[in-house]
Amino acid sequence: VTTSDLQEVLFPFEQQCLTSSDLESLLSNVNDAFRERGFITTRAYLRPQDLSEQSITLTVIEGRIAEIMLGEDTLEDQTQVFFAFPTGSGELLNIRDVEQGLDQMNRLSSNNAKMQISPGEQPGQSVVSITNETEKPISLTFGRENSGSTTTGKLQNTARLNVDNLMRLNDAWMLNYNRTARNY
């Protein structure tokens, strides 16, 4: 969240006496600004303070990723996380980055990755836990289609081999074979 974004949220509350209801609205607006930008675990709050100075101080706890864990968190799992997620441990937790990583994993047809965000050990930290119930990573299909031309033969026999995550990098390998079908 940029300084100008926060100034826009704070402006209506500046240079005036604020009631407790106004303070609640202020906090709500600031937290909404963080959430709207994807920072769902970042929170603003008011600490006890002396209001005789006629100013208030908002405290912001940045929501950070303690770790992103996949399955048993083996080296293979960590490699998959590294290649799928644009963020990692110690970074600000932006739900859009986490969703992007999940989408990268789920682009493989054999994956069904889901996430859960839970509190970390330190204030402001969260653990992103990924579970992935995979299906068979190999598929083989045969077919006949009429997408050929008169020069290649109208009917085409096809064979397709798809292998997901062969190198454990969220990779997809596809091998296609087409051949003109014989007319009987």
What are the language-model segments listed below?
Residues 1-148, 160, 177-184:
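Periplasmic polypeptide-binding modules associated with outer-membrane biogenesis and secretion
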Residues 14, 165-166:
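Short amphipathic alpha-helical signal-transduction/dimerization elements
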Residues 151-153:
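A generic structural micro-feature
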Residues 155-161:
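Hydrophobic, lipid-facing positions within transmembrane beta-strands of outer-membrane proteins
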Residues 166-172:
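Short loop/turn motifs that connect adjacent beta-strands in outer-membrane beta-barrel proteins
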